[in-house]
Amino acid sequence: MSNISVIGTGSYVPNNIITNDFLSTIVDTSDEWIRTRTGILERRISKGENTIYMATESAKEAIKNANIEANDLDLIIVATLTPDNFMPSTACSVQKEIGAINALCFDISAACSGFIYGLEIACSMLKNSFRNKALIIGAENLSKIVDWEDRNTCVLFGDGAGAAILSKTKEEGILEFHSGSNGLKGEHLTCGVLKANNTPNKNDRLEKNNFIKMNGKEIFRFAVGAMNETICNIQEKTKWNLNEVKYIISHQANSRIIEYTAKKLNTEKDKFYMNLDKYGNTSAASIPIALDEMNKRGLLNKKDKIILVGFGGGLTFGGVAIVWSI
């Protein structure tokens, strides 16, 4: 059976930068308060760029980086909480924009774990079918579902998209996954609760709560536990020692979560790649944006061992061990 490797990456973030100082003019906060509690200095907020546009731009970069054509793609999966439409899917819209006429396309919704889930689904589909190449995108326009009057959440999130292309290869590449869900704790991170009285028999306008709501303490506790469990499980499956792992690329939610996880694993914080100071929490886009940034900066060499790990609403979590092949 063929191996599956990452052969290209891409990303897109809006040019519009919103600083902590700016946020302090609209909610009761400060640069110092945000920095010390989250590690975030600024975030990118879309100015007209929708989810499809950002996803498409990241896809174009990944295709170029992989040195393939769009019609070489057999599968497109987009992980997003913030689609522009329910139909057509964001993946189908990206297919149209890039001309990937041979691709099967669909979206998934797994919050900040979405990119990891997308990788696992794509690997399974490539291994068990005639398909050879897949495009996985994490794309979010979170600014449209953030409550800009809630200082506990509006300081956290940003917009952007990241993408990776997978291909069947003879080289060692994507090795082991560990993923799961805990719906019992889903109430701690929510968005978009539809009203039960919206029925075909009523002419009421659809009402819904569009804003992200989060129980920060519970999510922090869950995140540290899920990250630790996932990384340890992947180590057990791969027989990797953390000293062999060049980088852990985690969901970019909060620097404190990463620091606590590093302590639990008895490893240095610098093993975790972080760029949340520039982009904030971009949900499903955060891991592929970080991966592409590392690729562009030349931080990853062929045969490097890396672990990707995510956690988020649902509640969801997941991780994957990868031997870098670019």
Curated annotation (Swiss-Prot):
<keyword id="KW-0808">Transferase</keyword>
<feature type="active site">
    <location>
        <position position="251"/>
    </location>
</feature>
<comment type="subunit">
    <text>Homodimer.</text>
</comment>
<dbReference type="Pfam" id="PF08545">
    <property type="entry name" value="ACP_syn_III"/>
</dbReference>
<dbReference type="InterPro" id="IPR013747">
    <property type="entry name" value="ACP_syn_III_C"/>
</dbReference>
<protein>
    <recommendedName>
        <fullName>Beta-ketoacyl-[acyl-carrier-protein] synthase III</fullName>
        <ecNumber>2.3.1.180</ecNumber>
    </recommendedName>
</protein>
<dbReference type="GO" id="GO:0044550">
    <property type="term" value="P:secondary metabolite biosynthetic process"/>
</dbReference>
<keyword id="KW-0276">Fatty acid metabolism</keyword>
<comment type="pathway">
    <text>Lipid metabolism; fatty acid biosynthesis.</text>
</comment>
<keyword id="KW-0012">Acyltransferase</keyword>
<comment type="similarity">
    <text>Belongs to the thiolase-like superfamily. FabH family.</text>
</comment>
<dbReference type="Pfam" id="PF08541">
    <property type="entry name" value="ACP_syn_III_C"/>
</dbReference>
<dbReference type="InterPro" id="IPR013751">
    <property type="entry name" value="ACP_syn_III_N"/>
</dbReference>
<dbReference type="GO" id="GO:0004315">
    <property type="term" value="F:3-oxoacyl-[acyl-carrier-protein] synthase activity"/>
</dbReference>
<keyword id="KW-0443">Lipid metabolism</keyword>
<keyword id="KW-0511">Multifunctional enzyme</keyword>
<dbReference type="InterPro" id="IPR016039">
    <property type="entry name" value="Thiolase-like"/>
</dbReference>
<keyword id="KW-0275">Fatty acid biosynthesis</keyword>
<comment type="function">
    <text>Catalyzes the condensation reaction of fatty acid synthesis by the addition to an acyl acceptor of two carbons from malonyl-ACP. Catalyzes the first condensation reaction which initiates fatty acid synthesis and may therefore play a role in governing the total rate of fatty acid production. Possesses both acetoacetyl-ACP synthase and acetyl transacylase activities. Its substrate specificity determines the biosynthesis of branched-chain and/or straight-chain of fatty acids.</text>
</comment>
<feature type="active site">
    <location>
        <position position="281"/>
    </location>
</feature>
<dbReference type="GO" id="GO:0033818">
    <property type="term" value="F:beta-ketoacyl-acyl-carrier-protein synthase III activity"/>
</dbReference>
<dbReference type="GO" id="GO:0005737">
    <property type="term" value="C:cytoplasm"/>
</dbReference>
<keyword id="KW-0444">Lipid biosynthesis</keyword>
<feature type="region of interest" description="ACP-binding">
    <location>
        <begin position="252"/>
        <end position="256"/>
    </location>
</feature>
<feature type="active site">
    <location>
        <position position="112"/>
    </location>
</feature>
<keyword id="KW-0963">Cytoplasm</keyword>
<dbReference type="GO" id="GO:0006633">
    <property type="term" value="P:fatty acid biosynthetic process"/>
</dbReference>
<dbReference type="InterPro" id="IPR004655">
    <property type="entry name" value="FabH"/>
</dbReference>
